[in-house]
Amino acid sequence: MENRIDRIKKQLHSSSYKLTPQREATVRVLLENEEDHLSAEDVYLLVKEKSPEIGLATVYRTLELLTELKVVDKINFGDGVSRYDLRKEGAAHFHHHLVCMECGAVDEIEEDLLEDVEEIIERDWKFKIKDHRLTFHGICHRCNGKETE
């Protein structure tokens, strides 16, 4: 975790920002909960447990800054709630998501399944793709299993 924090600190410094204690507390919460897709309120509640002096507005500002610097991605799964996801180190693209419409579970697909599609778009449309996001909405294997029982 400390290596990731050091890299994020360097990323902030390269854009003339500092990793303040408040920002570090927010980053640590994101790292500790990397498998989850936390809302700003979720992040705030977890930060508050360790650093009660940090306010909600500070957490919001920190998340917006981290989004702007591409340390995190701000995502919305169609439920009106923005969630924050740490960018995977070295990933050329944002990972994909499977969102269960029954239980709300969110699973991640790390593989870039759209390489062929990207090549066609770049070749035929002369469109230079910088990133993409793909979210599938359906019924997860856990809920699917319940239907057959």
Curated annotation (Swiss-Prot):
It comes from Bacillus subtilis (strain 168). Zn(2+) binds at H37, D85, H97, E108. One of its GO terms (biological process) is regulation of secondary metabolite biosynthetic process. This is Ferric uptake regulation protein. GO terms for cellular component: cytoplasm; protein-DNA complex. InterPro entries: FUR, Fur_C, WH-like_DNA-bd_sf, WH_DNA-bd_sf. It is found in: Cytoplasm. Homodimer. Residues 92-147 are annotated as: Dimerization.
